[in-house]
Amino acid sequence: MIHLGVDTLCWHLRLEHGAVTLEDVLEQAASLGSDFVQVNLHHVREREIAELLTLAARADEIGLRLLVSGDFLGEGRNGDAPAVGVGRIHAWLERAVALGSSLLRVVSGFYRADLMGRPELIEAERRYVVSVLRGALPAVDAAGVALLLENHSDFTVDEYRSLVTEAGGSTGVFLDLINPIAALDDPEPVVRALAPLARAGHVKDYVFESIPTDDGYHRRGFAVRYRYPGEGVADLPRLVAALREGLGGRDFHLSVEGLDNHADVDDQRQRLAPALALLRSLVA
């Protein structure tokens, strides 16, 4: 069964500027009928453990589960030792447990486009991530938390398979249905291939925008702009169908990642409502 939720990244700039609180976000998510909120730990970085326990209790009162996202594991190519990433996971894990999360999403420290043409550096990052995941697994497994690496426009499908296999334990994939676009890949085969390894993930949408010359005679290139589900050109019915097929009936938590947010624009509720309605129709 696919459970639908929202990520606190939808409110990122408003949270950073103090326009809303995490408590406000939980109330909005509950009013939208979300099953859960994917909490990016960046948004609770200044809260003590006791405050996180209170936040988790409030979420439980209004019928929400909280799942947790950590951040970048480090950069092996720039000399980070695996202990750097392991230390980060241990710190995130304590906060994930306080929030009652059954999983911890993490990401590598690079984008493939930045290392294109440097396969030795990409392999260095792959080895680094494997070492970090292996080093963190004893504590993660002891806490009963699944450690999920997001497909973050970094590794290929085969590399993800090798990462999960070599790391072992509770390691899996946090599957973003749209991120393959950033690597100019068709997302459907990626979703189909990684779904069996995934337990949670993100969904968004995108549009392409031309970047014209000053006189408009030709374009300098194009940009990919992220949007809320249903606002762009992604074939979400096909992607959700591929996800469902790969899951084989397993539980999966899919959160809307609204990266198109602004500090002075309060539009999350009006954009999330139709996005969630669309997704509900696709997972029914």
How should each PLM-predicted stretch be described?
Residues 1-10, 19-30, 157-174, 181-284:
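Histidine-acidic metal/acid-base catalytic patches
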Residues 31-33, 98-100, 132-147, 238-250, ...:
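A structural motif corresponding to the C-terminal end of an alpha-helix
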Residues 13-18, 39-51, 73-85, 114, ...:
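Acidic-and-aromatic substrate-binding clefts and catalytic sites of carbohydrate-active enzymes
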Residues 38, 67-68, 105, 199-202, ...:
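Conserved beta-strand positions in the central sheet of alpha/beta enzyme cores
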